[in-house]
């Protein structure tokens, strides 16, 4: 099939999964073109069936800001005409599903172009934050309902979309996935020595995110403070975002500034996750929780909030630990238990790795997208 994939290029679950999906589909013989504002973060090595097309939104003085939606629709029309897309797969409802909808209307109006089917994948904040905002909610609901097919990355997100936006679309759940050959235990001993300052007794606690408010990075610092009262540890922050600075300031205010290491955005996350002893994810909500799945694949235990899609792959006390978002004391207690009980630690990381390998590897999930593409194309021809 000829497939266009629209996504964000930044470090975040939706863009990472969209790019990994594009790479996997190309490897399986499909012609895939990625469309985004810039080269996606996880865009890998060259493949003859995979290409990238940037969207450029020029600035004109009469307009208050760049019109990315219109530029995106225009680019999708151009690339679809060139490659005769069977499907345009939009990851994240706004603005990508809206851009795909406009492109489909333009192609259909010409009377001579192939009109692709539009599939929208919902990832989380496109529904829970953007979609819930009255300024966007009707547009988001319209774009979802106008899609030929809709998927969500978790059962929780599907239920929340129906409840909050009252959409009529049939939403298929297809979860996120990982290349399980790539995501495995592969620690970097030199990195560990640097981060622990050559102290073999020091544990490394890590948080990976885009540092938006929903990720609650200040809560990460507070949980770390409580764990550190019982276990010698340092906190490693991976990623960039609006709340990173305030989280670091919070650590300094608590006298923990010297115990925090900021690594910024990192393309090669496997050795970092494998080097850590514990991952904290106290989010207010998670459409899926890809960073938790990545940690489990790398045999690093996760303590997280019992929200969104996380309970759909983390079983509390078995493959990880889940607590209400505001119960930071319980999260800290679970962290201390893992870091001081070797049997519990090994049992948890093995169970986590087993869950990933059984249910969330590329070969288990990508064929479900292929089947869904065929179903939508054949059903609506």
Regions found by a protein language model. Give the residues of each.
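N-terminal strand-loop element at the rim of the active site
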Residues: 5-12, 18, 23-68
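Conserved donor-binding/catalytic core segment of Leloir-type glycosyltransferases
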Residues: 151, 198-224
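Carbohydrate-associated surface elements
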Residues: 156, 177
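A short helix/loop element that forms part of the nucleotide-sugar donor recognition site in Leloir-type
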Residues: 184-198
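Nucleotide-activated donor-binding/catalytic signature segment of Leloir-type glycosyltransferases, i.e.
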Residues: 248-264
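Aromatic "clamp/platform" in nucleotide-sugar-dependent glycosyltransferases that forms part
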Residues: 265, 284
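Short hydrophobic beta-strand element within catalytic cores of glycosyltransferases
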Residues: 301-304, 314
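Conserved acidic donor-binding segment of nucleotide-sugar-dependent glycosyltransferases
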Residues: 316-317, 321-328, 337-342
């Amino acid at each position: 099939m000829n497939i266009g994939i629209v996504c964000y290029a930044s470090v975040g679950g939706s863009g990472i999964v969209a790019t990994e999906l594009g790479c996997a589909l190309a490897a399986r013989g499909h012609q895939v073109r990625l469309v985004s504002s810039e080269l996606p973060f996880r865009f890998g090595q060259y493949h003859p069936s995979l290409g990238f097309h940037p969207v450029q939104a020029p600035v004109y003085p009469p307009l208050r800001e760049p019109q990315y939606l219109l530029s995106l629709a225009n680019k999708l029309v151009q690339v679809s005409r060139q490659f005769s897309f069977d499907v345009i797969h939009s990851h994240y409802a706004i603005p990508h599903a809206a851009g795909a909808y406009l492109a489909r209307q333009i192609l259909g109006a010409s009377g001579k172009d192939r009109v692709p089917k539009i599939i929208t994948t919902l990832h989380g904040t496109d529904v829970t934050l953007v979609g819930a905002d009255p300024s966007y909610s009707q547009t988001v609901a319209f774009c979802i309902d106008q899609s030929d097919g809709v998927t969500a990355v978790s059962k929780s997100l599907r239920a929340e979309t129906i409840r909050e936006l009252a959409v009529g679309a049939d939403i298929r759940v297809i979860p996120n996935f990982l290349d399980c050959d790539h995501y495995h235990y592969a620690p970097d001993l030199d990195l560990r020595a640097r981060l622990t300052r050559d102290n073999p007794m020091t544990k490394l606690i890590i948080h990976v995110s885009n540092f938006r408010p929903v990720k609650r990075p200040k809560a990460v610092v507070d949980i770390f403070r409580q764990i550190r009262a019982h276990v010698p540890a340092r906190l490693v922050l991976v990623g960039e975002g609006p709340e990173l600075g305030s989280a670091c300031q919070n650590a300094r205010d608590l006298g923990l500034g010297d115990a925090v290491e900021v690594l910024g955005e990192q393309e090669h996350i496997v050795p970092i996750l494998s080097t850590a002893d514990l991952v904290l994810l106290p989010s207010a909500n998670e459409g899926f929780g890809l960073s938790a799945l990545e940690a489990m694949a790398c045999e690093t235990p996760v303590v997280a909030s019992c929200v969104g899609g996380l309970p759909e792959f983390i079983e509390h006390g078995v493959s990880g630990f889940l607590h209400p978002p505001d119960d930071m004391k319980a999260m800290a207690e679970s962290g201390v238990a893992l870091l001081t009980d070797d049997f519990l630690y090994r049992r948890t990381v093995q169970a986590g790795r087993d869950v990933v390998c059984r249910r969330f590897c590329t070969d288990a999930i990508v064929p479900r997208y292929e089947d869904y593409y065929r179903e939508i194309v054949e059903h609506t021809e």
